[in-house]
């Protein structure tokens, strides 16, 4: 079993390092959805995005805010991170 957990951890770490610099979606526990360029992520899932937009996740994903500076998202609120396919 320990081999499986080790493999899963390395796959997750590899995914996270591969998406740095790419456009991602980050969903928070509050239902807010952020999209932007992933600048950094740490072991606590704290996320820094640039060129970010903030949406409330719904059928129409209504735009709430567009940020001209970096956005920092606290890892305890992050539900998931996914690479945005263009």
From Swiss-Prot:
UniProt record, GO biological process: deadenylation-dependent decapping of nuclear-transcribed mRNA; maturation of SSU-rRNA; mRNA splicing, via spliceosome; rRNA processing; tRNA processing
Keywords assigned by UniProt, alphabetized: Cytoplasm, mRNA processing, mRNA splicing, Nucleus, Ribonucleoprotein, RNA-binding, rRNA processing, Spliceosome, tRNA processing
SUPFAM superfamilies reported for this sequence: Sm-like ribonucleoproteins
One Gene Ontology CC term in the entry: P-body
GO terms assigned for molecular function: RNA binding
Annotated PROSITE patterns: SM (PS52002)
Cell location: Cytoplasm; Nucleus, Nucleolus
InterPro entries named among the record's database cross-references: Lsm6/sSmF, LSM_dom_sf, Sm, Sm_dom_euk/arc
Domain Sm: 11-86
Consequence of substituting residue 74 to A: Reduces affinity for poly-U RNA ends
The organism's place on the tree of life at top rank: Eukaryota
Xref: SMART domains: Sm (SM00651)
Function: Component of LSm protein complexes, which are involved in RNA processing and may function in a chaperone-like manner. Component of the cytoplasmic LSM1-LSM7 complex which is involved in mRNA degradation by activating the decapping step. Together with PAT1, the LSM1-LSM7 complex binds to osmotic stress-activated mRNAs to attenuate the osmotic stress response, probably by limiting ribosome access to the mRNA and consequently translation. Component of the nuclear LSM2-LSM8 complex, which is involved in spliceosome assembly.
PANTHER family reported in the protein's UniProt record: SMALL NUCLEAR RIBONUCLEOPROTEIN F SNRNP-F, U6 SNRNA-ASSOCIATED SM-LIKE PROTEIN LSM6
Assembly, per entry: Component of the heptameric LSM1-LSM7 complex that forms a seven-membered ring structure with a donut shape. The LSm subunits are arranged in the order LSM1, LSM2, LSM3, LSM6, LSM5, LSM7 and LSM4. Except for LSM1, where a C-terminal helix crosses the ring structure to form additional interactions with LSM3 and LSM6, each subunit interacts only with its two neighboring subunits. The LSM1-LSM7 complex interacts with PAT1; within the complex PAT1 has direct interactions with LSM2 and LSM3. The LSM1-LSM7 complex interacts with XRN1.
Family designation: Belongs to the snRNP Sm proteins family. SmF/LSm6 subfamily.
Protein name per the record: LSM complex subunit LSM6
């Amino acid at each position: 079993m320990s081999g499986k957990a080790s493999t899963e951890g390395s796959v997750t770490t590899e995914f996270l390092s591969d998406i740095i610099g790419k456009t991602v979606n980050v969903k928070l526990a509050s239902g807010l959805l952020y999209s932007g360029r992933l600048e950094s992520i740490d072991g606590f899932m704290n996320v820094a995005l640039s060129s970010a937009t903030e949406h409330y996740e719904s059928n129409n994903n209504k735009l709430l805010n567009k940020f001209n500076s970096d956005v920092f998202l606290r890892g305890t609120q992050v539900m998931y991170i996914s690479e945005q396919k263009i």
